[in-house]
Amino acid sequence: MSSINPSLYNDNGVYCSKVIVTKAIKIRDLDQIPQTVLALAATNNGANYDYASPNYITNARKRFKARLNRNPIWYPKMGDTAAIFFARSDQAGWDIRAEVDEAILYTQKQYPHIDINYAVLTPVNTHDLVDMNLIAQLFAEDDAAAAAAANQPNQPNQGQ
């Protein structure tokens, strides 16, 4: 079914930089699935979250809705078909892969129709989850592109 892309890890088993985050978000454009991306925040802020707990999902919604200041996209809505996972770690040596794996397993169990494309982490010791301004900018670009495409007259398919 779904799996973590091993190319997202560096030699130390730690997820790569924000460049990878950018590419992961842009998968919405590549797959032409705007507004169908689920990003579930698998975070550690000094507390141990039970990833199978509804409270974990609820808290993640509140936290990231406030930070992104846009419609939440990190939990399943009607029509969601794909997932991107974000996580962070404040401690060197924290098993950040297991942190995301737990959330992936929960999502696969609760929402089997969701196709998990990427699991993305910022480097260890990064204070912020990711560059939220960057993410908001990319979402805005995607939304603008989708709006522009919606205003174009339908082009006939050629050779298909």
From Swiss-Prot:
Native species: Dictyostelium discoideum (Social amoeba)
Annotated GO biological process: aggregation involved in sorocarp development; positive regulation of gene expression
Repeat listed as a keyword: yes
Protein name as catalogued: Vegetative-specific protein V4
Biological role: Unknown. Its expression during growth is not required for growth but for the proper initiation of development, therefore playing a role in the transition from growth to development.
Key words, A-Z: Developmental protein, Growth regulation, Repeat
Residue segments, region 3 X 3 AA tandem repeats of N-Q-[PG]: 151-159
TM ranges: none
UniProt KW Ribosomal protein keyword: no
Taxonomic superkingdom: Eukaryota
Residue stretches of each Sequence repeat: 151-153, 154-156, 157-159
